[in-house]
């Protein structure tokens, strides 16, 4: 994992720590993963499609149950990343859960500030339901900003009377755009990927003219009651630690089933190193097992 952490720091954190924040540079470095070698599960099929007017990729592992689905929102601070660059992560979770994953190419800020990504998430979620996937057979998956988008989508679904998914698996979710102090400062040096120096710029790029404290932007600022079971994975060395721990605490206080698994000293989004890093394989197996069980099927693992 040291090489993975070093590469992530050099590619992303160095751009986030530069004297001036060049969002285009940050985006390019976040997206370089799509050009790096990756290994996908044997027998995986990739099917580009459009759902609710949004470009998506269906990732269907061999032996998957087609009566259920997982909708995946990628990370990237709302300004970068893509379903393509995070395909390996989504594909290996799909294999572990024996469930097709719909990876969403939502619109990015600053060209498309809030509510563009949020609207895309809701459109795809609604389209998957309309296609006949029962809510009890539907899960959500999200990492970093995509984790925040997943929780925001669940809040909105509840508020609008749309059926909620059966469960959500979240990787180091960014859940409070207004947060300061705490792990944001305590882990500023130890976080191998993220940096605070231009955090306000990223928030402004996504929030635009909207209040970043709005629950659909910062789900930890909202009422979590009624949400489905959630599994959260986070590293103790990253600046988003407080978001994950806060979701567990606030969720349990609201009567939810939320488990936050804390991993020691790993880089942000270490799961994206699957299948090369053993820590990533173990984490992805856990994510897949959680979703597999919640969506009603025996568990399958990552090799």
Residue ranges, per PLM feature:
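Alpha/beta-hydrolase superfamily serine-hydrolase fold, recognizing
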Residues: 47, 52-303
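A glycine/proline-hinged amphipathic helix-loop "lid/cap" segment
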Residues: 1-64, 296-303
């Amino acid at each position: 994992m040291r090489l993975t952490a070093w590469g992530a720091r050099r590619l992303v954190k160095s751009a986030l720590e530069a004297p001036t924040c060049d969002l285009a540079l940050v985006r390019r470095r976040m997206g370089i993963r799509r050009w790096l070698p990756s290994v996908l599960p044997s027998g995986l099929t990739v099917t580009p499609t459009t759902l609710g007017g949004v470009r998506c990729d269906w990732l269907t592992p061999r032996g998957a149950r087609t009566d259920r689905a997982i909708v995946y929102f990628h990370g990237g601070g709302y300004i970068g990343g893509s379903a393509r660059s995070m395909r390996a992560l989504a594909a290996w979770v799909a294999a572990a859960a024996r469930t097709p994953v719909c990876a969403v190419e939502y619109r990015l800020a600053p060209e498309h500030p809030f509510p563009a990504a949020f609207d895309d998430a809701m459109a795809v979620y609604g389209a998957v339901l309309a296609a006949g996937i029962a809510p009890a057979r539907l899960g959500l998956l999200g990492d970093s900003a995509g984790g925040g988008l997943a929780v925001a989508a669940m809040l909105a679904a509840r508020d609008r009377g749309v059926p909620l998914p059966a469960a959500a698996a979240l990787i180091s979710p960014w859940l409070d755009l207004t947060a300061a102090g705490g792990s944001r400062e305590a882990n500023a040096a130890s976080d191998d990927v993220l940096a605070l120096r231009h955090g306000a710029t990223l928030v402004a790029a996504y929030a635009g003219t909207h209040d970043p404290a709005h629950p659909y932007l910062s789900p930890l600022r909202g009422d979590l009651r009624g949400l489905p079971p959630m599994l959260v994975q986070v590293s103790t060395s990253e600046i988003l630690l407080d978001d994950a721990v806060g979701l567990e605490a606030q969720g349990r206080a609201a009567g939810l089933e939320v488990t936050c698994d804390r991993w020691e000293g790993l880089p942000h989004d270490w799961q994206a190193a699957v299948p090369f890093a053993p820590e990533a394989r173990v984490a992805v197996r856990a994510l897949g097992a959680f979703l597999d069980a919640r969506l009603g099927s025996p568990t399958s693992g990552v090799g």
